[in-house]
Structures are given as structure tokens and as C-alpha cells.
């Protein structure tokens, strides 16, 4: 038990001590399925271009599409970025000021981020990031 707990703890802390540690549980849940869903979505990315523009223009106002684009942005960013600073810092800071204001996606991104991790990840991830 102890040996397992330590490796697990180190495993989570290895990626990131605090940022990823707490973020992994909340984000891990949506990330797992999200990444899988995004995998196909990313692959379809080439075919989605037509849908992306449409979804962005008309969907951002809608609910389902809004969560899809934002989800794709934060999750994929988090994966490739490895939670460097784009996801943590980008979500709170850029999402609110530079990115959130000028961009429509950031706006929905904040919504999706709040809605997705909402209870478990929302406050936790925000508090940790902040």
C-alpha cells in the first residue's frame, strides 16, 4: 500500500507538483474521455474545418457546440502543452483578459472550463492556478 501510494503520488507530482496534481484528478476525468473524443475530433479536424467555422460562428452562441470548441482548445492545449502555462495561466488570465475578451472561443472556453470541471475542477483548478 505504501509503496503503491508513493509511486502514485510521485507519478502525479512528476508531471507537476501542485498545478497538475490537483488538476489531474478533475481534468483527468474529462481529459480521458475528452482526449479520446478529441482524438477522433482532431483526426476529423481536417474534415471539421467546415463545421468548425460554422460551429464557431453560430455555435458559440449555442450550448453544445460552445462546449465542444472550448473543450477542444483547453484540453488539446493542456495535453501538448503539458500544462506548461498556457492551460493554467491561459485559462485564468488570458481567458479573462486578452484571450477571453477579444476572442469568442476564450469566452466559451471559460464557460466550458467552468461548466466542465465546474464543481471539482472549476474552483480547484482555478484556485490552484490562481
From Swiss-Prot:
An annotated GO cellular component: nucleus
Family named by the database record: Belongs to the BCL9 family.
Intracellular or extracellular location(s): Nucleus
Biased amino acid composition, Pro residues: 62-73
PANTHER family named among the record's database cross-references: B-CELL CLL_LYMPHOMA 9 PROTEIN, BCL9
Ranges annotated as biased composition (Gly residues): 80-98
Region (Disordered): 1-130
Protein name: B-cell CLL/lymphoma 9 protein
Assembly with partners or alone: Binds to beta-catenin (CTNNB1), PYGO1 and PYGO2; the interaction with PYGO1 increases PYGO1 affinity to histone H3 methylated at 'Lys 4'.
Coiled-coil parts of chain: none
Keywords: Nucleus, Wnt signaling pathway
Gene Ontology biological process: canonical Wnt signaling pathway
Compositionally skewed regions (Polar residues) per UniProt: 1-16
Gene label: BCL9
Organism: Sus scrofa
Described purpose of this protein according to its UniProt entry: Involved in signal transduction through the Wnt pathway. Promotes beta-catenin's transcriptional activity.
